[in-house]
Amino acid sequence: MPPKRKTLNAAAEANAHADGHADGNADGHVANTAASSNNARFADLTNIDTPGLGPTTTTLLVEPARSKRQRVSRACDQCRAAREKCDGIQPACFPCVSQGRSCTYQASPKKRGVQTGYIRTLELALAWMFENVARSEDALHNLLVRDAGQGSALLVGKDSPAAERLHARWATSRVNKSITRLLSGQAAQDPSEDGQSPSEDINVQDAGAKTSDFPHAPHLTFSAPKSSTAETRTLPGPVRPPISANTLENNLQPDGTGIGKLPPNHWRLLDIYFSYTHSWLPILEKKDMYQALYQYSEQGSLLPSANVESGVHAELWSALALASFQAAATAASSATGPASAAHGHDNAINPSPADISDTARKLIPLESGPFQVQHCRALLLLCLVSLGRDDWESAWLLVGFAVRVLLVVRTQLPPDDDRPRPRMRALLVACFIVDTIVSMRHNVPAHLKPDDIADLPLPEDGQDQWEPWTPCEGLGGEHTMLQMLRNPAYPLSTFNHLYGVTKLVALELLPRIRTSSQNAPLEFRSRLQQVIGHNSPFSVFVLSQDTASAFVPTAYLTRTVYLWAAAFSEPLNEHYSHLLIETLDQYQKRFGTYAIPPLIPSLLDSLLALKKQSHSSERHRRHLEELFPAYSSIWPRGGRHSNTGLQPIRQLELPPTATATASIMPHVMEQPLSTSINPVNDRFNGIPNPTPYNSDAALDAITQTNDYGSVNTHGILSTYPPPATHLNEASVALAPGGAPPRPPPPYVDSTTNHPPYHSNLVPMANFGYSTVDYDAMVDDLASIEYTDAVDVDPQFMTNLGFVPGCNFSDISTYEQ
C-alpha cells in the first residue's frame, strides 16, 4: 500500500510540474488553481489513518491553495468586442497592455431587466406622494380593497384594457423618463424641456376603460364647471359679476383671506346641523355630507382630485352656513357688545357666517344651470338662513327658486328610474312646508299649492328615524342630562307631522279665513288631531292636557306647530296661545334659545297678525307683541333691516307699583282663562316689531265677537285644564346659563287664608335677576272677587277633579 500511494503522489507532482510551465498563457493561473486543488485533495488522502495499518506518512511537501479568481464588474471595450477575458484594471487592463492595443471604458452599459434601484425609487416616490398629496393613500387603498376586487384586478391584471392603458401612460410619462435618467447616471431634465407630456397624447377613449368607470373610484381629474354666459341674477342680494369656472376654482382653492376653505370648526357646525335642523328637516344624506367633507384637506382646502361640478359642495356649505349662524348667535349671547364672531371682519382665520353663506350661494348656478337636486337642497337651506335673519324677501325668492329647480330636475329624470323618487318627493314636501309658512306670514302667493302634492305620508322606517339624538354643548340648555338619555328624535315622523299640519291649514283654514269665517268648524279640529294620531311617537306629549316635558327638540317643535294651528283656527280663544307660549318657554330652557328652528318666528308673527285683525283682547295682543319679536331677532338681521350686531335678549320689567298692576286687572276679569298669563313670564324688549302682516284685504270681513268665557268643550283639546297649570318641576330643573327655574305664578283665593306663593327674585330672559314689589301685586289680587269668575264656569272645577258646583269655600271648610 505505501508504494502505491507514493506512485499517486508522484503522478500528482508530475502533473503540477507540467502545468507550471503554462503560466505564460492567459489561462495559466486557472490551471494552477486546479492543480493546487488536486494537490490539496491528494494531500488529504495521504493523511488518512487506515484501520489496522497505523498512520501513514508522506515524503512530499504540499503547496498552499491559491485564492479563487474573482469576476470583474466591467470589462473594457476591446476585451468585450474580442470576447476575451479582462481583469478590469483601469485605465488599461493587462490583456490590452500585453497585446499593445488601446484600452477604453466608454460604451454605456445595457443591462437586462430593471435597473438597479428602480423598485426602491418607485417606493420612495409613492411615500413622498402619500406625505405631500393629501388623502392620496386613502384613494389608492380604497382602489385596492373595495369594489369587489375590481380595483386590485386593475393593478395586477395582465389582460385588462384599463391596465394596459395605465401602463402605456406610465411608460410615456415624464416621471418615468426622469427616473430612467437618474438611474443611468444622467441628470434629470426639466419637464418643460420635454414639451407636452406624452401621456396627454394617448387616446384614453380607445385605450380601454377608465379608472372612474369602476364604482366609487375616486376622480383623478380636476375639471371646472361650464361657465355661465348669463349676466343677470334672479335672487336678491348685492349684484355680482357672472360666475365663471376660474372664479369658482379660486373660491374653492385656498387664498390669503381664508375664504373658500372650510371653517376650522366645520365638524362642530355639521354636528349642530344634524342635531337641530336635520332632526326635523331630513332632506340631506349624511353619507354624502361626510363624503364631500373628506374631499377637503386637513387645512380646509379642496383637493385637486375633487369633483367641483358636484352639487354636494353647495349643500355642504349651505348646511355649514345655517349652523354657523346658530353657533355665532350662541357665542354672542355670552359676550358683551356686538358679536364679532357673527360678522368675522376682524378675524382673518375664521370665516364669518355671512362669508360661508356667500360661498354656498356662489356654488349654486345661475338661472341658466345646469342644476342638480343638491342645488335645490342648498337653496332651501339658504332660505332658512334668510328666515333666521328676518329677511323674508330673500327667503320667499329663494324658496321659489328651489321649487322651480326641483321641477326642472324632475323633468330630466329617466322615466324608468325610480331610485331618486323618494328623496325627490321628500324634498318637494320640504319646499311646500317652508313656502306655505313664508307666504302665510307676509300674505303673498305661495309657489306650491296643496293640490300639487299627492297624499303621503312618507315612510317612517330608515336610519334617520332611529338614530339617537345628541345635543351640542355650548348652545344652552340641559345638554349634560340629555346626552345621557340618547333618545331618538324621530325625524321622519316629525317631518310627516309638519307636512300634515301645514297642508291642513293651507287646504281648509286659509280659505275660510279669507272668506270672513270667524272660527274653523269642529271638523278642522278633529282632522288636526288625526294628523298627529294616537300612535305617533309624540302623541301623548303633543295632545297632553298640561305642559308636559320631553327630551328631544322635535317633540317641542311638533307641539308648537300643532298649537299654532289650533290657535290660528280660533284667533279669539287665548287658551292655545298660552299653551304655545309655555311650550316655547320650556323649549328655550331645555335646548337653548338659538336652537329654535327659523320657522318658529314666522309662525308666531302670522299668529300675532291674525289676532290683531280679529280684534282679540288688547292685553293679550300686547303680551304677544312683547314676546314674539324676540324669537325673530336672535340672529343678525339681513336685507333692508340689516344690523351690525346681535340684539341682546332682555326682559320687560313689570310695573313696580300696584297702580300700574291694577290698571291691567280689569282685562283679566273679562276672561277667566286669561289668568293663565304668568306675571313673571320671561319677556323681551328693545327689539323692533317685524313688518306688519299685510292681510287687510283678506281679513277685512272678519267681524268682532264677544270673547270666550271658557274653553270650548267640543274642541280638539276639550279636556284641557285652565292654562294656568304650572310647569313640571322636573322638566325645568335647569335653565340656560345655570339659572334656577322660574317660580310658578301666584294664585290667590279670597276665601282662604293660605299665604300666596311668590318670590322677590324673578329670573330674566338674559338670566339675570330683577327685584319686583310683589307684595302690592298680591294685595291687589287678593282684593279681587276671583271666585265669582270661577262660579260662572262649573267646568273649571270639574277639570280640576272636583264635583260640579264645588267652590273653594267648600274645600276650605272641608280642610278645617
Swiss-Prot record:
Domain of life: Eukaryota
Localization of this protein: Nucleus
Keyword Zinc-finger: no
Keyword annotations: Activator, DNA-binding, Metal-binding, Nucleus, Quinate metabolism, Transcription, Transcription regulation, Zinc
Reported induction: Expression is induced in the presence of quinic acid. The expression of qa-lf appears to be autoregulated.
Stretches for region Disordered: 184-235
Record carries keyword ATP-binding: no
Main subcellular localisation: nucleus
DNA-binding region: 76-103
Pfam families from the UniProt entry: Fungal_trans (PF04082), Zn_clus (PF00172)
Gene Ontology molecular function terms on file: DNA binding; DNA-binding transcription factor activity; DNA-binding transcription factor activity, RNA polymerase II-specific; zinc ion binding
One GO CC term, this protein: nucleus
GO biological process, one term: DNA-templated transcription
InterPro entries: Metabolic/Drug-Res_Regulator, Transcription_factor_dom_fun, Zn2-C6_fun-type_DNA-bd_sf, Zn2Cys6_DnaBD
Biased composition (Polar residues): 184-202
Protein function: Transcription activator; part of the qa gene cluster that mediates the catabolism of quinic acid (QA) and as such, allows the use of QA as a sole carbon source. Activates the expression of qa cluster genes by binding to a 16 base-pair consensus sequence 5'-GGRTAARYRYTTAYCC-3' present in the promoters of the target genes. Regulates its own expression.
Protein name: Transcription factor qa-1f
Taxonomic path: Eukaryota, Fungi, Dikarya, Ascomycota, Pezizomycotina
